C-alpha cells in the first residue's frame, strides 16, 4: 500500500538547464517535495537541444522519464494513473494537447504550473 502522495509533473525540462530556467526551478521544487516524502515522476519531451546538453540525466529525487510524442506520453500517464495529481508546466511542447490528454485521464487533481510567472 502506498502512503506517500504521488505527483506527476509534465514539464519543459528537468534533465537540462541549458537555455532555460525551468530545470533549476523544477529541481529545487522537486528536491523539496522529495524531502517531504512525496513520490515524484517527471515526464519530459525528448528534444535534441536538451538531449545534447543534459546536466542531470538521472536525478536522485524523482523518476525522470523522457517521451518522444503524445502517444508515448499517453502510455506514461496511463502507467501513473494512480497519481494523486498531474501538474503540467508552461511551455511544454504541444501544451494544449498535453492538457487535454491529462484531463482525459481524470486524475484526482489536475493543475497548471505557470513556471514563468516570476520572469
What are these regions (language model features)?
Residues 1-2, 84:
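Non-catalytic N-terminal targeting/anchoring module and adjacent flexible stem/linker
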Residues 2-19:
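Nucleotide-activated donor-dependent transferases that construct or modify glycoconjugates
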Residues 19, 26-31, 40-119:
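Extended catalytic core of nucleotide-activated donor transferases of GT-like folds
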Amino acid at each position: 500500500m502506498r502512503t506517500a502522495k504521488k505527483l506527476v509533473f509534465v514539464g519543459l525540462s528537468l534533465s537540462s538547464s541549458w537555455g532555460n530556467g525551468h530545470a533549476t526551478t523544477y529541481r529545487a521544487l522537486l528536491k523539496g517535495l522529495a524531502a517531504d516524502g512525496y513520490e515524484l515522476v517527471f515526464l519530459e519531451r525528448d528534444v535534441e537541444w536538451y538531449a545534447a546538453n543534459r546536466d542531470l540525466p538521472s536525478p536522485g529525487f524523482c523518476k525522470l522519464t523522457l517521451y518522444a510524442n503524445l502517444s508515448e506520453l499517453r502510455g506514461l500517464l496511463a502507467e501513473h494513473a494512480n497519481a494523486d495529481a498531474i501538474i503540467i508546466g508552461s511551455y511544454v511542447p504541444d501544451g494544449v494537447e498535453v492538457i487535454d490528454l491529462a484531463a482525459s485521464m481524470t486524475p484526482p487533481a489536475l493543475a497548471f504550473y505557470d513556471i514563468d510567472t516570476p520572469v
